[in-house]
Structure formats: C-alpha cells, structure tokens
C-alpha cells in the first residue's frame, strides 16, 4: 500500500530495509517540505513495500499506476465551471455528451436540460436553456479532460528511471 512518508533529503529511491526477509521499499514523488517561513526541512515522498527485490517492471507499474490514479482523480473532481464543482465521472461524461449531441441535432429543441453539480453535501443545479451555453460547458469540460491527460502523459514521459535501474543493478 502506498503511503506518504517524511524523511531526509537524498533518500534512496529503492532501499533494502530488511536483508534477512528481503524487504524492499520503493519511493517516488519526492517533494521538499517547507515550514511556515518557507524554509526547506526534509522531504516527503510516497513509498510502497515489497517482500522481494522488485523488478524494473514492478517499479514502473507501481509509480505509473499511482500517476494514472492521480490523473484520474484530477479529471474526476478538479473541473470547475462558473464557480461550480463538476464531477466528471465516466457516467456523467456520457450524460453530458448525450445531452450536448441531442441539443446539437435538434438545434436546441431538446433543451432545457438540468445537471446537478457541486458535491453530495452542497449540490447545485443548473438549467441549460440555450445551446450556446451547453456547448460552452461541454467544450470546456472536454478541454479540461484533454489538458489533464496531456499533462499526465508529459509527466510520465519525463519520468527518469535511471536511478531506479542503477539501484536495482547494485
């Protein structure tokens, strides 16, 4: 299980923590810690434990799996439209597309349509009465998803695996 841990700068990305039982920890997302004055004080990182020396494929699966989950979470709950939080689950994306497509095909005759935004504790309902407003919402939602995916792909492509490979080959 991945967990956020705090430690010293220069922490090893792969470490055998118990040679007798062949326990290894793999670490990633190393970030500096700052106090209230902005002074750096150690680092935080994610780590997971293996009961064997991990392979490079296992390291990549672990780190990329976390990155994919982070991207999915950003898509799911990070979009805000007109000050309202929009939940972009797969089901909601389908519903937004279906409503948009039908409105375009009927030149707006299928409107109005109401969507629930916000969250469980503070829902907000918005009525789309004009095709232009629905199109604006839908296009911005799709642009947000595409931007998050592009940013995620760039982060994964920029990942430097050489330190992991070096530590695994020691």
Language-model-derived ranges and their functions:
Residues 2-170:
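A preference for well-ordered globular domain cores
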